[in-house]
Amino acid sequence: MKKSILLLSLLFSVTSPVVAGQDVDIVANIKNNTCQSGISNNGNIDLGVVGVGDFTGNISAENYHPGGKEFTITVQDCTLQGTGNVLNQLHINFRALSGVMATGSSQIFANEDNAGAKNVGVVIFSIQDPANTFNVLSATGSSRSVYPVMSSALNNSSWKFSTRMQKIDPALNVTSGPLISHVLVDIYYE
């Protein structure tokens, strides 16, 4: 009898399910000072059709090159904190909706069409100040689009940008095909 109970308890301990705890990390950032935004042409930007030969130059993702498509972001309905006309820092952050940038670059938004053009993505430049045009992302991928603006000028303000296609690896050829990239824009001020 002793042997049967021992054997049954051993069988049950081996076949019973094991439950292990798992952690879930949830992160959020809540701000009082957000704004609504509008993007020209409802955020649809058509870069047109270009030939693969148009990518032969040595234009980097860091350098602004005229000829891209311009678009405007309008900032409105900002919940202004405090009173008076004070200097604010307006942040307009661009990030890939998929979370994936072009391989080897933190400044080039990837082509999301896997069957599409290869070795080409999209870059976005701030052209608000023609004397100071810059890629909205630094070489490390952090946002550079921070603008000083007075409280009185914040609501209904417009900000100019330009976007174009960008060769990713200068040593490789661009291949033909469609290009699509979804970019999320976050706007806040401090």
Q: What positions do the PLM features span?
A:
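Gram-negative bacterial Sec-dependent N-terminal signal peptides
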Residues: 1-20
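Mature extracellular/passenger domains of Gram-negative fimbrial/pilin and adhesin proteins
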Residues: 19-190
